[in-house]
Structures are given as C-alpha cells and as structure tokens.
C-alpha cells in the first residue's frame, strides 16, 4: 500500500481507522427543507437577567503554639495560619413576561 501523509506531516503506511471502507457516513440534508424564521428579538427590558452572587469565607486562626507539625515549622508558615472554608452560590432570576 502507498504511504499516506497525515495532518502532522508524518507518513503512514496504513489508513486511519476512521477511513475504513465499510464505515457509513452520516447523511446531510439536501437543503430543500423550509428555512426557519430568525428568532424574534426582545426588548432589553423584557430579557433582563438578575444575578445574585454570594461568597463567604470562614477563617480559623491557629496560634504558633498550636502548630504541632514540625514540617510546618520548618517551612516557616505564618504564625497566624488561616484555614478557610469557601463556597459560592449563584442564583439566576429571569423576570416573568
């Protein structure tokens, strides 16, 4: 079989699996279907969206005496190490028409 070039310029001696002769190609539309009308544009006031975003952090301060891990002391962690719990809530409201 002749060598074929791929997109990367590397010569291949066998065709790709997707080029098998028994593979069926999906049929495309012939273009004779009725065209769909373009969606009607709404006024800005009717299509407004309200986003409410809430973000909260809880900080737990750890004093140097509470740091028991020697590895943490070797890495010079800030004496007031902060552990934070975070969450984000996003709510989308679409006004009724």
Curated annotation (Swiss-Prot):
InterPro entries in alphabetical order: SPAN-X_fam
Classification via Pfam families: SPAN-X
Region (Disordered): 1-46
Record GO cellular component, one term: cytoplasm
Expressing tissues: Detected in testis, sperm and a melanoma cell line.
Residue window of motif Nuclear localization signal: 37-45
Cytoplasm is among the record's keywords: yes
Localization, UniProt: Cytoplasm; Nucleus
Top-rank taxon, per record: Eukaryota
Keywords for the protein's UniProt record, in alphabetical order: Cytoplasm, Nucleus
Family the UniProt entry places it in: Belongs to the SPAN-X family.
Descriptive protein name: Sperm protein associated with the nucleus on the X chromosome D
